[in-house]
Every structure is written in C-alpha cells, then in structure tokens.
Amino acid sequence: ANKKNSMKPMLDASGDQALWYTGEEIVVFDFGSNTEVWRETVKCKKSKAPNFAYYCFGMLSPRQSKAAYRVTEDEYVLVDLKSAQKVVIPNAGWHPFFSPDDQCFSVGGKFYLTQTGEEMDNPFPFSVRQGLSFSDTCAVRTRGSLMAVQQDRGSSPIELWDTGSGQLLATIDDPFVVRQVNFAFTKSGLVLHTDCGAMSIYSCAL
C-alpha cells in the first residue's frame, strides 16, 4: 500500500480483538471467542491534504469496550461495542487516544467522555500539547494504569506515567533515537525500536 493512501492503515488490536477496514466496512472481531463483535458500512472520504489520500482511521480502546473511527475531515465517531450506540465527536484534530479505563477519548488536545461525547477537563496527569499537526508526534501506549507518552517530535523523550497515582515514573531519552522511534508495551516492560535499528528494552512493573 502507498504510504499516502491514508492517515494510517485502519488496523488496530487490543487484547483478543482486532479492528480493520475491508474497503467497504469496519470490522471488529474477537479472536479469543472467534466471534464478530461489530461491523459498520462506511466510505472513507478523499482528502485534499498533501500528506494522505483518504481519511481512514480506526482504533480500539484499552479495555475493548469502545472503538473510534474517522472517515471524514471534521469528526470522529465513538462506538460502544456492546450496545453498538454511536457518539459523534466534532473535531478535525489529530492524534487520538483513549484513557486506560475507556472513559475518556482525547483528540486534537481536547477531551471527551466516551459515553456521551461531552467535552471535559484533562483527566490525565500529563498535559497534552495543543495545536499539533498531522506531521507532529503525539504517541500514546497504554498497559494497565501505565501510559507511555511522546509528544512534539518523533525524537522527543518518552514519559512513563502511572495514571493511578498520577506519578511520572521515568523519562526515557534513548541515545539510539535520531529522528524517530516506535515503542510498545510487552508483558514485562517497554520496548523501543529506533531508527538506528537498535532495540532497547526498559523493564517496568506492569
């Protein structure tokens, strides 16, 4: 697939569930129980932006109770995967993520209750940068109450927060990162894959 095909391939996984776009429908499937959870017919709108061709984004929440997707320029849709009820979030911003308890959805530096779509104050112990563009970085990874957060640029330090206590546990400024790093939680730590080809593993109590 061409890099400019979409904002990001509409593919995500959380727990035993996976979300993907078939070209006509968004599907959420539970591979643990081998059952389809939710399906919706959508059409991804063509973009006028130079960075990507279509608005085509979807993600699952950490506890797999919600999904979020964007197929047009100025709104996100939150879906309750048990009731299939939808809430529309009017927001043309970038870099969406859920809170660890699935109760809050953040995008474009704003925060919303996932049940109602009502805007709320920042519930996180860290501030979220305002005005970040598509090409800026706001990457968030969640495991239990831990959140690893990187903002501004792909080479910025990664902060590890415990949302339960509100404490900043660590700031990781990996020496092998030049311009970009990808990071993810494993069962026992946080793994960084840098643009130097190095793999760094940081242990943390999960």
Language-model regions: role of each:
Residues 19, 68, 106, 146-149, ...:
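Structural core positions within WD40/WD-like beta-propeller blades
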